[in-house]
């Protein structure tokens, strides 16, 4: 099995890259985010690899990090999610945002993925909510905020600040993570305007 490839970029396809490793060209399928982050033809690249062996083909999937590869594997444990859909999800949400979306049970963020309907998105955030933290870095403040939002016990300024950031065009996971951090910095009793200001500062980092 191939676990990692290191070589030079030969060329790109719609959803794959040809990686030249000592004269052998490997066709590696990647998420759109990974493809965008790779260098131009001739540049050096290292990809973590997931190898799929079928009766009629061998297919390689490449990732910028082991964490992205683990998400790829985990997503496919959900009913209705195959390799193509898993890559599409990772094209829409990087690992950190996906972890926060699941922690916040934000199915709308996952459903923005092409080919993922509301039912599949709900299965992803429901079935993976207890699995993702095993290897993903999820801010404890986000997890705590998730519980408060679920129980409708989050302070009004917090919910208003999240809504304000979402209205500014930020995704729910990013907005919630930023306000969770802002709330932790500002302490109890922080007003909406202060949380928004701190949240925007957090998002600009």
Swiss-Prot record:
Pfam families cross-referenced by the UniProt entry: HHH_5, RuvA_C, RuvA_N
Gene Ontology molecular function: ATP binding; four-way junction DNA binding; four-way junction helicase activity
A cellular component term, taken from the record's GO annotations: Holliday junction resolvase complex
Single Gene Ontology BP annotation: DNA recombination
Region (Flexible linker): 144-153
Main location: cytoplasm
Residue ranges, annotated region (Domain II): 65-143
Subcellular location: Cytoplasm
Region (Domain III): 153-205
Region listing for Domain I, in residue ranges: 1-64
Superkingdom of the organism of origin: Bacteria
Keywords for the protein's UniProt record, in alphabetical order: Cytoplasm, DNA damage, DNA recombination, DNA repair, DNA-binding
InterPro entries reported for this sequence: DNA_helicase_Holl-junc_RuvA_I (IPR013849), Hlx-hairpin-Hlx_DNA-bd_motif (IPR003583), NA-bd_OB-fold (IPR012340), RuvA (IPR000085), RuvA_2-like (IPR010994), RuvA_C (IPR011114), RuvA_C_sf (IPR036267)
Transmembrane segments: none
Role summary: The RuvA-RuvB-RuvC complex processes Holliday junction (HJ) DNA during genetic recombination and DNA repair, while the RuvA-RuvB complex plays an important role in the rescue of blocked DNA replication forks via replication fork reversal (RFR). RuvA specifically binds to HJ cruciform DNA, conferring on it an open structure. The RuvB hexamer acts as an ATP-dependent pump, pulling dsDNA into and through the RuvAB complex. HJ branch migration allows RuvC to scan DNA until it finds its consensus sequence, where it cleaves and resolves the cruciform DNA.
Family annotation (NCBIfam families): ruvA
Similarity annotation: Belongs to the RuvA family.
Domain comment in the entry: Has three domains with a flexible linker between the domains II and III and assumes an 'L' shape. Domain III is highly mobile and contacts RuvB.
Quaternary state and interactors: Homotetramer. Forms an RuvA(8)-RuvB(12)-Holliday junction (HJ) complex. HJ DNA is sandwiched between 2 RuvA tetramers; dsDNA enters through RuvA and exits via RuvB. An RuvB hexamer assembles on each DNA strand where it exits the tetramer. Each RuvB hexamer is contacted by two RuvA subunits (via domain III) on 2 adjacent RuvB subunits; this complex drives branch migration. In the full resolvosome a probable DNA-RuvA(4)-RuvB(12)-RuvC(2) complex forms which resolves the HJ.
Listed name of the protein: Holliday junction branch migration complex subunit RuvA
